[in-house]
Amino acid sequence: MQKIDKTLEEWRAMLDPEQYQVCRLKGTERPFTGKYNSEKRAGTYHCICCDLPLFDSNTKFDSGCGWPSFYAPIEDSAMIETRDTSHGMIRTEVTCAQCDAHLGHVFPDGPPPTGLRYCINSVCLDFKPRDGA
């Protein structure tokens, strides 16, 4: 995987303001407002910044948290996990391994088979439906 390295100014020029705030400045969209929170079609979720495939719809589940939730990425190598102690909490941040976009966080309270919940901001994703979906 080839790493993508752009300046913040380059990212700002290619992303809309909300995408830039969340993906590049580690913001968070408000719960239950993201366009993919209730998405049910079959397909693949890609990084909005670099188009790397991140999640398959087969691993998406309704966690009730207000953000799209998945129990596993397509490939473990697509994500980088980092300890996040911001906002007085201890969490694990997940970023895109190809472009370092902030995606969300992973928590150990998901369903089988992994027991993980990848809580991802919709604004960081680009959904590509499977043919016929």
From Swiss-Prot:
<keyword id="KW-0479">Metal-binding</keyword>
<comment type="similarity">
    <text>Belongs to the MsrB Met sulfoxide reductase family.</text>
</comment>
<feature type="domain" description="MsrB">
    <location>
        <begin position="8"/>
        <end position="130"/>
    </location>
</feature>
<feature type="binding site">
    <location>
        <position position="96"/>
    </location>
    <ligand>
        <name>Zn(2+)</name>
    </ligand>
</feature>
<dbReference type="Pfam" id="PF01641">
    <property type="entry name" value="SelR"/>
</dbReference>
<feature type="binding site">
    <location>
        <position position="47"/>
    </location>
    <ligand>
        <name>Zn(2+)</name>
    </ligand>
</feature>
<feature type="active site" description="Nucleophile">
    <location>
        <position position="119"/>
    </location>
</feature>
<dbReference type="GO" id="GO:0008270">
    <property type="term" value="F:zinc ion binding"/>
</dbReference>
<protein>
    <recommendedName>
        <fullName>Peptide methionine sulfoxide reductase MsrB</fullName>
        <ecNumber>1.8.4.12</ecNumber>
    </recommendedName>
</protein>
<keyword id="KW-0862">Zinc</keyword>
<dbReference type="InterPro" id="IPR011057">
    <property type="entry name" value="Mss4-like_sf"/>
</dbReference>
<dbReference type="GO" id="GO:0033743">
    <property type="term" value="F:peptide-methionine (R)-S-oxide reductase activity"/>
</dbReference>
<dbReference type="GO" id="GO:0030091">
    <property type="term" value="P:protein repair"/>
</dbReference>
<keyword id="KW-0560">Oxidoreductase</keyword>
<dbReference type="InterPro" id="IPR002579">
    <property type="entry name" value="Met_Sox_Rdtase_MsrB_dom"/>
</dbReference>
<feature type="binding site">
    <location>
        <position position="50"/>
    </location>
    <ligand>
        <name>Zn(2+)</name>
    </ligand>
</feature>
<dbReference type="GO" id="GO:0005737">
    <property type="term" value="C:cytoplasm"/>
</dbReference>
<dbReference type="InterPro" id="IPR028427">
    <property type="entry name" value="Met_Sox_Rdtase_MsrB"/>
</dbReference>
<dbReference type="GO" id="GO:0006979">
    <property type="term" value="P:response to oxidative stress"/>
</dbReference>
<feature type="binding site">
    <location>
        <position position="99"/>
    </location>
    <ligand>
        <name>Zn(2+)</name>
    </ligand>
</feature>
